[in-house]
Amino acid sequence: MADSHDAPFRLRSYQAEMVEESMQSNIICVMDTGSGKTHIAIDRTRAELEICRPDKIVWFLAPTVTLCEQQFAVFKSNLPGYGIQLLSGKDNLDHWTDQGVWDDVLLNIRIVLSTHQVLLDALSHGFVKMRNLSLLIFDEAHHCSLKHPAHRIMSDFYKPRIGTELPRILGLSASPIKTAKVTSEDLQQIERNLCATVKTPKLHRSELLRYVHRPHLMRIDYPVEPQDLQSNMLSFLKSAYTNYDLQKDPWVSELLQQRQQGHDVTKNIHKVFIGGKTYCRDQLRSLALKAEAMSQELGMSVMDWYLRGCITQFSKMVHMSDSQLLDWSADEKRHLLEILRTLPSIDLNSHDIPPMSLGSMSHKLQLLIKFLVAEAKHDPEFTCLVFVEQRVWVACIAEVLAIHPETRDLLRVGTFVGESENSKRKANIASISEPRNQQATLENFRAGKLNLILATSVLEEGIDVSSCHLVVCFESPKNLKSFVQRRGRARKEESKYVIFVPQAGRRRDPESWQSLEEGMKAAYLDDLRQVKLATEKEQQSETGHRNFEVKSTGALLTLDNASQHLHHFCSILGAGPYIDNRPQFEFTEIRPGVITARVILPLTVDPEVRTACALDTWATEKMAKQDAAFEAYKALYVAGLVNDNLLPARQEADDELSELQIPDHRPSLVPVSPTLDPWPLFARHQQQNPHVYYRTRLTLHTVDDKPKHLILLTPKILPDIPELLLYWNSSTKLKIESSWLHDVVLNDEEISELKSVTYKILYSVFHNRMELNRRDFVWLVAPCDESGLLDSRIWLSEWRQHTCLATELIAQNSDWSLWGLVNQKGDARKYTPRSTSMNNQLWLLQLMQLPKRRDFLHPVLESANINDAYTKTDEMAAKDCIVDPVPAPYSVFALLLPSILHRFGMAIIAETLRTTLLGPVALDSAHSLLLTRALKSSAADGNDNYQRLEFLGDCILKFIATVHLMAANPKWPESHLTAKKGRIVSNGFLARATIAAGLDRFMITKSFTGAKWAPRYAGDLLAETGPAVKEERSSKLIADIIESLIGACYTVGGFEKAVLCVQTLLPLEPWISVPAANSILHEAAPAEADLMGLDVLETLIGYTFKKKPLLLEALTHASFSGPHVHCSYERLEFLGDAVLDYIISKRLHAHSPELSHQKMHAIRTATVNASFLAFRLFETTIDEETINKTSMRPESQKRAIWQFLRSGSPSLNANRDNALRQHEQVRDEIIIGLNEAARFPWHLFALTDPPKFLSDMVESVIGAVYIDSLGDILTCEAIVRRLGILDCLDHILCNGVDCLHPKERLGHLAVDKGVQYARVGMNTEPNEGDKMYKCQVKVGGEDVGDVAEGLKRLNAETVAAWKAVGVLESRKDSAIEIVSDVEEFFDADDGGGISLDDP
């Protein structure tokens, strides 16, 4: 079978054809060695296990134990999710005499690999039944003939049961016939034996020939060694055998002694003397024959070394009582050793084998050395496989090459001779010098540590050997099968296949072998002549004319440019390290000279347009290919995957919006309208209805005093605002309650009086910022009682016109609670009176200082050094104090009015937005506060701003966009969906939409300070008629407002309101509601009823699929080309990413107490990053019980989702296994870090580098469950919890785990010092050749922490940052300070935050 370590592959179309043929009927797949039969077996097995019942078994049969062992490893690597068992004679199967033992060993086993004899015996004894098997795979199927166990399996147990429940048959072979005399009857016999039909990929023969490189066949003639040359040692050995005295043989002596003792051994004695066979004599004969053959093949000096080695090793084993000689009697060992002592040049006193002499090597061996040296020197990438007939010759040639001066430093030699013969027989002295089998030889050869393997025929059939550029047959192949199999090992381009041929030999010339092979293949594949003819026809001139024009643009598709267009389309579908996105073409010769073609596009393309056929027939493949490409590309255009310019579909920006030239990639400053000023509208209403006023009662609650009331009159009704909290100082808070009163109609006199009262109240505090005697206020204020009635004390006659001394008021016995603000003579500071007292005939005032602050909306930080003077009572002499005329409580109200009116102003903006732009969303007035929060940037309010809602809205928009695009574009590949979604949620697109809708007018971007506050006058507001001056704002901030409003609408009414908001603010896209999209996606999903083998997977996931193909699609990598495939998982991963993000973000936003947006971003990044998801994928397992075939004790096998990934890339499997090793190395540390550490263990995850497809699997499974459950988020949450993600999130939230990334934390610790990650050298570590990235953190130019290393740059920088953080935090002066007063926050998708993917 083909080696599985070749370059990454996409199952070639001829391989896919063979799998499909096998799904339909029993076949014998005949393809050249190296053409990928292993991949066919793997995909056919996977397909069978997906559709058969869970109690069925796939049984793979191979002719040798070595081949079984190799394929066992291949199956385990490619199908790790299924129980796999290897059975061989090593397992002492002859002791398994009870059905219970077999039942135990096969418990939860889905794939068995064994030799044919193992299955035959199991069937013969009834331990295994044919009805229990679902698929029988016969590797090297040409063995199924005569009395071979493969044939007996079929003749004794399969054919008699035809008509009952039987397994499918798949035969694999490169040579269906083992002999040179091939007839049609021979082929038919093999087909009859296997109840199958010989199939070869006739449809794709041209492709097959492209991938299978036939080597250049050459011969090396060598002279046969003279027969009369003899060495003294060999002559003595042959003489010892010829003149062997049977009377002295220990076995004969024992028989004669038994006869003397009365035992009836006459028959045995007669047999010995007639046949002359005893064990000692047979050993001499075997040694002499092997030595004589070796002298002919390798030469006298090599033969002498071999004999000395065998005899010396035998002597050593006798003296050490080696276990290999346990079956020998002591007399036999001594007797044979004494005979061998008589050989010349043998010194049995030394146990060291004398060195070999190179003086008398055979001409054949010398030619081999000369040829190998020449080839190795010519080709720096020399790799060679030398087939040698006998095992002992392998050892001898290896020794020659190891010591020969021309080869010892040039060739790196390994040996491979497979398993020894029956290990239960007595040791053979002639085989003592055989090389022991070295399994590491193959691994070292693949790794390049060896460049030449000396092997016996065991490497002919199926053993996984990397492709060689040179294959040498030291002896001519014994049969056609050997010739074909060995030739298949030379699979590199420009490779050579060399056969040594004796000049006087009788064996066939290699050219005749090739001729016979072609004749044999013609019996079942009569296409070689057609291929040759097709090659000639390809060189002929053929033209075609067909056009397709897009009327709107004039873009023209022709037969000549279609292939180029199609290749470009496929190239941008999304590249990957394991994926070949090129279109594949198949050609079919309908009749001689008439060809048609079919093209197959990558798996990411929708099935409806994935294939296309040529419209016409052609004489050449070139034109058929162009025709198929033309039809394919036209179909892509019709499906909307190609635009009117005949380019891959791209969403053009709206012309009107694109004129704004706002880039999509990063924040930039763009001109926007200033924030809506609500008061001019009030002035116009006042002008139109001067006597109508709407009343709002304001109530001030303080800690010590009783509530104070003020009525606010406005020409338009004010929106209702909730209780307003004002900050008097760092410890004292004031509350303002507002309530609506019925509107009133005032006469001119009442209005005039109210304006005067308003003027007096405001003037008491803001006299420096008011125009003298100007009273055209747009709103009015006046004292009122609890019911809202105007206080009688408002009449001007009751209020003094001027200030007066405090002593005068005391003398008048005036109530101090009605006094105005107090100040000392010559001091502008104002105080509120608290009480009066007499001390030593001196009146004293207890006063509390009035704050100079004008902003009471924001808390006063302790660090601001605001003392407690605003609540502490000071004492002053009354004679030094001046009292203002307006009662102090109303002056305090006036001091608070700017803050109150600012809050009302923001509420008016939000209410205006609610009733205008957001009118279609139908929000209630009660939601104005939420809208206000959604409109405020962090610069406007550092505590209560849009950022939490933006965090939620960003996620909601991406979710809505994802499900909408999936439903609206069912044929779009993931790359198109990702590009379109990226444009919809990009800063540029959202900023353009914000400006186009006029939403920028509602953004509140400036923080209230009150420092320059002054009352607004109606005359000024009405006079403002010029165009508003544009302001520059960040496009990110503008875009965030849409997301925050979406978040607010979702908070109010879930996805229904959120989608209405999206439809309103982003009207260019024809949005589909979430429920409608869910229905569309569910209905579009394929539903097949014959997938019965997914029980383990569904148990792992914790969900039973109604449409099971969705589950297979979620686990199908784009490199897969097997059966039962709808699409690869990219679209589901695209959806699952949004679903997972939504589940996490929703829980974070709903958490109580509320989390800051920085914490939410950090936690979400931690719980959805690729390393964490891959970790959870590895950790999510179930136990499956199996029985250890050696100890017969139960064992628990871990089954995991990742084991069921359907891919077609060996390199993907290698990277998966590497990620699993990394996981196992750090698993315990990560678990402790996740469960016990106060900080998320970013630095431990940085020690792993899982490939993206692992985290993709998590998201694709979630996406599949979402579609299958019709968008049931609770079901999806259950899956996310099953994967351990939500449990980790709960732990983080419950224990306050800090998830800030070390690189971000280091930036905070560094404050204003620059942070650099300086790369240190470029070292290649010896461990698997991984290139490790090393870096050193520098803070302010100083090295901090140790040098850190990682598999990639980001990994190394993360570990380095973690180390540096530890150093800085250990210093006394370090303190982390997270800056939160920035105007906007960047998340990872928008270019900010921490991205965990190495760029």
From Swiss-Prot:
A motif (DEAH box) lies at residues 139-142. Its EC number is 3.1.26.-, 3.6.4.-. Residues 562-656 form the Dicer dsRNA-binding fold domain. The keyword Manganese applies. Disulfide bonds: none annotated. Residues 1301-1370 form the DRBM domain. ATP binds at residues 31-38. Mg(2+) binds at residues 1133, 1256, 1259. Residues 18-194 form the Helicase ATP-binding domain. It holds the Pfam family Ribonuclease_3. Residues 897-1054, 1094-1270 form the RNase III domain. The keyword Protein biosynthesis does not apply. Its cofactor is Mg(2+); Mn(2+). CDD domains: DEXHc_dicer, RIBOc, SF2_C_dicer. One of its GO terms (biological process) is defense response to virus. Keywords: Antiviral defense, Antiviral protein, ATP-binding, Helicase, Hydrolase, Magnesium, Manganese, Metal-binding, Nucleotide-binding, Repeat, RNA-binding. InterPro entries: DEAD/DEAH_box_helicase_dom (IPR011545), Dicer_dimer_sf (IPR038248), Dicer_dimerisation_dom (IPR005034), DSRM_2 (IPR056755), Helicase_ATP-bd (IPR014001), Helicase_C-like (IPR001650), P-loop_NTPase (IPR027417), RNase_III_dom (IPR000999). It comes from the Eukaryota. Gene3D superfamilies: Dicer dimerisation domain, P-loop containing nucleotide triphosphate hydrolases, Ribonuclease III domain. Belongs to the helicase family. Dicer subfamily. This is Dicer-like protein 2. It comes from Phaeosphaeria nodorum (strain SN15 / ATCC MYA-4574 / FGSC 10173) (Glume blotch fungus).
